[in-house]
Amino acid sequence: MSSIQRIAVIMAGGSGERFWPVSRRLHPKQLLRLTSPTDTMLHESVNRLKPLINPAHIYVQTSEELVPAIRAAGLGIPDENVIAEPCRRNTAGCLAYAAAHMLARYGGDGSSLSMAVVTADHRIGDNTAFAETVAKILEVVESEPVLGTIGIPPTRPSTGFGYIQAIIDDVPKDLGSVPQSFTVQAFREKPPLDVAKHYVANGDYFWNSGMFFWNIATFVREFDGADPTYGKAIRAMAEAMTRGDMPGVVKIFEGLTSISIDDALMEKAHKVAMVNATVAWDDIG
């Protein structure tokens, strides 16, 4: 594959209702210092990506009403890299919109663009180890036509996370310290406690981190197979953005089914690669 431009998209559209009244509609959790005494969660998210991706190519995708506050937050990225979704269409709509934006901005069919997707509400224990994990999965999706994700080795039988079942013949002894690539067998919904205990004991199940990685051309092609209306919409939105037809973009986006990226694409994709995280992680949602 020719020279690849790496792009990152931080999903930051949530309102953080769990943290009310500290987190409010126009000052949500991603703009609070919840996991660091000095940095907001968005600052932390951007800083984790900087070792791998130039800040000029780091984007934050959010709601229209949060754009001013995020642009004023001093994240060290260009103002135009704060992208507003026209309305809410769950994570599938969010990432379809992001892909269309990148196709319009960078041109081409996306084959020279790889995209890392993270969220602004994760607690990550070690930025260096995180960067090593992300670098590994980016290498995978840049070398073969697969979608990618990061799996978190479970530390307890949690009923609060979805799980990823990986194909592992023998669980490596260094699984907790060396990022390795595995093929995903299945995505599992949040389980009851007895099932979660089975997953943890089995050794080939990981928490679903909700982080995704792909070459954009591969992403669009996979949507062509999983949900052709989404593949068509991504291309149509990119074309409308290129010619400056934002009302047309909004009309297309509003017509999308509101569905998660797991349900719409990841569970139906031809092949998904997973790299195990080697860092402490939690979703504080």
Show where each model-derived region lies.
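Structural signal for hydrophobic packing residues in well-ordered secondary-structure cores
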Residues: 46, 50-53, 74, 102, ...
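Catalytic core of tubulin tyrosine ligase-like
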Residues: 163-285
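Solvent-exposed alpha-helices and their adjacent loops that cap or buttress functional pockets
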Residues: 1-4, 11, 51-53, 107-111, ...
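Conserved N-terminal catalytic core of the sugar/cofactor nucleotidyltransferase
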Residues: 1-11, 17-28, 35-119, 123-131, ...
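Short, well-ordered, mixed-charge alpha-helical segments that flank or form enzyme active sites
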Residues: 68, 91-92, 123-127, 156-161, ...
